[in-house]
Amino acid sequence: MNAPSIAQDVTTVPVSLGNRSYDILIGKGLVDRAGEELAKRLKGVRVAVVTDENVAKAHLERLTASFAKAGVDVTPVIVAPGEKSKSFGTLETVTNAVLAARLERGDAVVAFGGGVVGDLSGFVAGIVRRGMNFVQMPTSLLSQVDSSVGGKTGVNTAHGKNLVGVFYQPQLVLADTEVLDTLSPREFRAGYAEVAKYGLIDRPDFFEWLEQNWQEVFSGGAARTQAIAESCRCKAAVVARDERETGDRALLNLGHTFGHALETATGYDSTRLVHGEGVAIGMALAHRFSVKMNLCGIEDAERVEAHLKAVGLPYRLSDVPGGLPPAEKLMDYIAQDKKVARGALTFILTRGIGQSFIAKDVPPAAVLGFLKERLETK
């Protein structure tokens, strides 16, 4: 079978997973070309487009027109915006909507939104009829560079974030960089935390490039597409090595152990903290904790903080509005982290910028003492 032809102005990043490999297409105008791109790959399918109220208002009409032009029948399923939609209740609502539309296993669920919509929709696609086709159309910077790639899906519980879900790969990812122009500055900054993360994991050259070019990434120049594509390449390489997070893939959680604890502590209240902001603080804390453990030089931790501060991201616990619970309570949330194995704490720590590693059996007393110190740091 011949590979589908792709417009010249679109960057393609392959995700190599054997017979479950797929492409990430990155460029402007992909919302208007979505019907054409999907019809090339999944002939004769009907789709449920899962989106949130904000994205629906801004972009759904264009997307449904694109599908109609390609002869693709669409059932829109609209959920409330925000982290609170990553719940069992919303999962049931969306599942019932897909079943009510009589969509079959060979049809597709299309996630048209940010990370919440993508995680929720992928879970639905993975469990309805034991697995439907799945297409990611991420509309936030965070979802374009991170959550839409690699097949992680799921919902939150009262015990913590992303504790229930499945690995379920999409057949296609369409990342329209034009829709990022409609994001609020705060949403864009939050997504940028995940971009910076790739440099901090194992690409010091990329982090240095971001330090020099972040303003053009924010303003929407060619550097934006370059940053998104490079981030996707970084993630695709890790996912190809370790799809189900039994080893290296855990590196992608740099900043997330602390960050998820902060999200849980703030009740997933987006007026106080959104995911990318939690990750930004978490990455700064991971570097500071690495300094405390004599793994990393103070100058690298300060460089990370300086960059986060320059782009307008929070980097201290005191940056979380409304205060935080005591260190002991934060430790309770950390103990629920997915990377905990046989009760031992696992963190992604670093020996310097671009030198992150998986640290197992991290002493809880050291983490507790560190959190107490940072809670007192203004």
From Swiss-Prot:
Binds 1 divalent metal cation per subunit. Can use either Co(2+) or Zn(2+). Its EC number is 4.2.3.4. It catalyses: 7-phospho-2-dehydro-3-deoxy-D-arabino-heptonate = 3-dehydroquinate + phosphate. NAD(+) binds at residues 115-119, 139-140, 152, 161. Its cofactor is Co(2+); Zn(2+); NAD(+). Keywords: Amino-acid biosynthesis, Aromatic amino acid biosynthesis, Cobalt, Cytoplasm, Lyase, Metal-binding, NAD, Nucleotide-binding, Zinc. Pathway: Metabolic intermediate biosynthesis; chorismate biosynthesis; chorismate from D-erythrose 4-phosphate and phosphoenolpyruvate: step 2/7. GO terms for molecular function: 3-dehydroquinate synthase activity; metal ion binding; nucleotide binding. Zn(2+) binds at residues 194, 256, 275. SUPFAM superfamilies: Dehydroquinate synthase-like. It comes from the Bacteria. The keyword Thylakoid does not apply. InterPro entries: Dehydroquinate_synthase, DHQ_synth_AroB, DHQ_synth_fam, DHQS/DOIS_N, DHQS_C. GO terms for biological process: amino acid biosynthetic process; aromatic amino acid family biosynthetic process; chorismate biosynthetic process. GO terms for cellular component: cytoplasm. Pfam families: DHQ_synthase (PF01761), DHQS_C (PF24621). Signal peptide: none annotated. It is found in: Cytoplasm. Catalyzes the conversion of 3-deoxy-D-arabino-heptulosonate 7-phosphate (DAHP) to dehydroquinate (DHQ). NCBIfam families: aroB. Belongs to the sugar phosphate cyclases superfamily. Dehydroquinate synthase family. This is 3-dehydroquinate synthase. It comes from Brucella anthropi (strain ATCC 49188 / DSM 6882 / CCUG 24695 / JCM 21032 / LMG 3331 / NBRC 15819 / NCTC 12168 / Alc 37). The lineage of its organism: Bacteria, Pseudomonadati, Pseudomonadota, Alphaproteobacteria, Hyphomicrobiales. The gene is aroB.
